[in-house]
């Protein structure tokens, strides 16, 4: 009788374990907006009740694919993490409603995603890269009570300062003849000219976006760039790679005066060759109340790829101290 009881108990435990382990990691989350309900795509990897990282991709309008490098590091450290395509991005709905492409919308979208995934202040670590860093900061300024920590990767707290750095520092590092030609296209706002795009791709990207020859870019990165939602990108970021210009909605974004409001553990990740000023990224870590700075000496804007060892060693160390 006892043997049968324990046999039955073992079977129940085994079946419950199988059910948990085989649970579908993909979750489609309904997002409610003033323009109706839409679905966004998420995918969970791992299981850790105290360390759950939600990844906010850049763009705006890119997707989760360039984060797949995390698969080579986080599972070994037992860090649970979530891929998430923001509304308008590849695997999520694309309602093509311009009123939704705002910081305010995306902050509330992240909050709805958090609730659906069951994340809370005891486990919720938010990591935003580039535009995702803007979104992460804005989310934390409104909802930091829900966060365990915030990680801002390769983003500064001021777009006007970013514009100044791009125009007066990085641009001047280009060959003068190349820069003259680039600026001739920008002067007439000919941002879609094939030669302009080639000049940027051949001369700017390999130095400051990802320091890997374009022909050798990882497929996950190439796919993320190829699938970017340009209407969102153009509305929020604008057409130029030398800062945010024109009528782009992020042009005047600046939270330098608000950083001191952030009390949660905060990691700023910068890189020597980034499109963003590494000095500003370090300064940001000193402005918040509980900040840390990680420098990637060999990296650029995609430091998780071109300085991966420094990037992930520092990132994982920060997460493990929480």
Predicted regions located by residue number:
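Active-site loop/oxyanion-hole signature of alpha/beta-hydrolase fold enzymes
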Residues: 86-127, 131
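Conserved alpha/beta-hydrolase "acid-adjacent" motif
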Residues: 275-280
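Conserved HGGG/HGGXW glycine-rich cap/lid loop of the alpha/beta-hydrolase fold
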Residues: 38-94
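Catalytic active-site module of serine/aspartate enzymes centered on a nucleophile-bearing elbow/loop
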Residues: 291-322
